[in-house]
Amino acid sequence: MNLTALKNMPVSELITLGEKMGLENLARMRKQDIIFAILKQHAKSGEDIFGDGVLEILQDGFGFLRSADSSYLAGPDDIYVSPSQIRRFNLRTGDTIAGKIRPPKEGERYFALLKVNEVNYDKPENARSKILFENLTPLHANSRLRMERGNGSTEDLTARVLDLASPIGRGQRGLIVAPPKAGKTILLQNIAQSIAYNHPDCVLMVLLIDERPEEVTEMQRLVKGEVVASTFDEPASRHVQVAEMVIEKAKRLVEHKKDVIILLDSITRLARAYNTVVPASGKVLTGGVDANALHRPKRFFGAARNVEEGGSLTIIATALVDTGSKMDEVIYEEFKGTGNMELPLSRKIAEKRVFPAIDYNRSGTRKEELLTLPDELQKMWILRKIIHPMSEIDAMEFLLNKLAMTKTNDEFFDMMKRS
């Protein structure tokens, strides 16, 4: 029996399965407790149980395998990993581990890991020779992540505008600057769907911090990738723990030469959470931001890089502006120059209900010549010269009208050449 398979089952099916095994009063229990009871009952028959999860090492030296389904929240179905196993396989927080597990003995509360079968979807022996993330060489993004799907749909227009305004590469550190109600969540959903469609080889993770629960459900249903969330009714310490787990998992995968993409909504709320959690230093900046609070969210955002040894970590984060909060302005100013791609959204365009509400003239990517072919780059620059004199609303309407006449950006450039 596999623990992960049980976690993916709906509660109604779990209750039916438990009742077949002779368990009672399951309807009043939480999902994690039902799984725990089923596995315990299954283990009595002497059959093997397998489980997996993402390792979180605690201060005492031992660790637990947390589940992505519960957004890495501690629960009764977590798997205990002993300090000797952590030392033997040189494990670190964020490692994805799969293996054989055993039920808790007398006086124990958790399942325990017996045998490690896989570390980060690879053989355990291979994990020992990897280079630490901190020792990898960062480079400019030089491999393009195309957003355009080429199906001519209205959703694809957003992706095509993105490709023209600010191309995204593997290892990009991008900032979407968004006022309220400018369509940032829909934009992130579009990016996620484009990545899943065009780049299935990439590991996609969507991290939602301080979001509404219904938006989390919507994202989980729309996105083919891992959606990890901490909703606004959770404490700040929980936001921080979730973010740390996601970034550590991403770093471990990059060490195994994987291309990882994190879409974060939003870095402002994450910085606010760190501001609440960090011990007071006594130095307070404008807006009530502690002087030490922004170091850790900067380390999170700064982890995005293209790696010379293979693999990359891309982070596209949203930053909130015009919220009326001085703290949000300070946080945005701190992150302003750190990214190598910026995509400002405009409230004026959104108020006219023109979507995507991208401010074309202000958006752009550093070193875009590494991501685009010289011929395409030339055409993009000509397009910028045409659009530059227009107001932000006219520019977006003009671009969307012209793009709607064609199915792909190549066709659009051909049409532009002819006219």
Curated annotation (Swiss-Prot):
Lineage, uppermost ranks: Bacteria, Pseudomonadati, Pseudomonadota, Gammaproteobacteria, Enterobacterales
Protein name as catalogued: Transcription termination factor Rho
InterPro entries according to UniProt: AAA+_ATPase (IPR003593), ATPase_F1/V1/A1_a/bsu_nucl-bd (IPR000194), CSD (IPR011129), NA-bd_OB-fold (IPR012340), P-loop_NTPase (IPR027417), Rho-like_N (IPR011112), Rho_factor_ATP-bd (IPR041703), Rho_N_sf (IPR036269)
EC number: 3.6.4.-
Biological process, per Gene Ontology: DNA-templated transcription termination
Record keywords, A-Z: ATP-binding, Helicase, Hydrolase, Nucleotide-binding, RNA-binding, Transcription, Transcription regulation, Transcription termination
Family, similarity comment: Belongs to the Rho family.
Job of this protein: Facilitates transcription termination by a mechanism that involves Rho binding to the nascent RNA, activation of Rho's RNA-dependent ATPase activity, and release of the mRNA from the DNA template.
